[in-house]
Each structure stands twice: as structure tokens, then as C-alpha cells.
Amino acid sequence: MMIEVLKSKIHCARVTEANLNYMGSITIDENLLDAANMIAGEKVYIADNNNGERFETYIIKGERGSGKICLNGAAARKVQPDDIVIIMSYALMDFEEAKSFKPTVIFPDPATNSVVK
């Protein structure tokens, strides 16, 4: 049996922009993507800690080292700059494999969205 489990999580990143006039997605600093084991085009689930919104979109790679977390298109209506969001991706895997699987979870610096070691 296959089940869906948490694969990666960027916990408590700060939204830097909301761009309504860009075709959908979330732009994420490439350093954060690497640290969280996420890739461009990957489907993500986003929870906004400030307003309780939850929604899905896909990733666009942002400039490395920029700290950028930008919600684009319709998703821009769901957040405000400086909101704190949790960005999660999931993977399908065999039930037995899932029992021992450990997701990648990162906690970026809340002021800069830089990767904290």
C-alpha cells in the first residue's frame, strides 16, 4: 500500500512579496530549496500562520541568497508581506518505507529567510 507522507518542510518563513500580476506559484530562494530538499515545479502546500489560510501551488526557483518568499498570481490574495508561512511538500511511498522515513525540515532565520545551520 502507498501512503502520502511529509517529505520536506520550510517552517516559519517570512513572506517577502505578494505579486498578483504574475502567473501562479511561489518563488523560493534557491538556498532554501536546496536545504529543504525541494525543487522547481514541485507541488507544495502552504499554511499562513497569520491568517489561517491554507492552499496549494508549485515552486519557482528564486535567486540564491535573496531570502525571497513571493506568492504569485491568485495565491498573492491569500497572504501579506511579512506573514509567516509553513511550506510543505509530500511524497508517496510504500507503507513500510514510510515507517522509518525522516522528512527534511528547516527553520529559516525569521528576519532574513536565510538557512540556519
Swiss-Prot record:
Q: What does the note accompanying the cofactor annotation read?
A: Binds 1 pyruvoyl group covalently per subunit.
GO cellular component term of the entry, any: cytosol
Cite the EC number.
Answer: 4.1.1.11
The protein's predominant localisation is cytoplasm
Annotated compartments: Cytoplasm
Amino-acid positions noted as binding substrate in the UniProt annotation, renumbered to this chain: 57, 73-75
Report the top EC class in one word: lyase
Q: In which pathway does it act?
A: Cofactor biosynthesis; (R)-pantothenate biosynthesis; beta-alanine from L-aspartate: step 1/1
Please give the InterPro entries that the UniProt record associates with this protein: Asp_de-COase-like_dom_sf, Asp_decarbox
User: What are the record keywords, sorted?
Assistant: Autocatalytic cleavage, Cytoplasm, Decarboxylase, Lyase, Pantothenate biosynthesis, Pyruvate, Schiff base, Zymogen
So where's the catalytic machinery, residue-wise? 25 (schiff-base intermediate with substrate), 58 (proton donor)
Which superkingdom? Bacteria
Q: Does the keyword Lyase apply?
A: yes
Q: Which residues carry this modification: Pyruvic acid (Ser)?
A: 25
Could you state what the record's PTM comment says about this protein? Answer: Is synthesized initially as an inactive proenzyme, which is activated by self-cleavage at a specific serine bond to produce a beta-subunit with a hydroxyl group at its C-terminus and an alpha-subunit with a pyruvoyl group at its N-terminus.
Q: Which Pfam families match?
A: Asp_decarbox
Catalytic function, reaction form? L-aspartate + H(+) = beta-alanine + CO2
Gene Ontology molecular function: any one = aspartate 1-decarboxylase activity
- Which PANTHER family does this entry report, sorted A to Z? ASPARTATE 1-DECARBOXYLASE (PTHR21012:SF0)
Which NCBIfam families is this protein grouped with? Answer: panD
Instruction: Describe its assembly.
Output: Heterooctamer of four alpha and four beta subunits.
Protein function = Catalyzes the pyruvoyl-dependent decarboxylation of aspartate to produce beta-alanine.
Q: Which family does it belong to?
A: Belongs to the PanD family.
What name appears for this protein in its UniProt entry?
A: Aspartate 1-decarboxylase
Per the record, the gene is panD
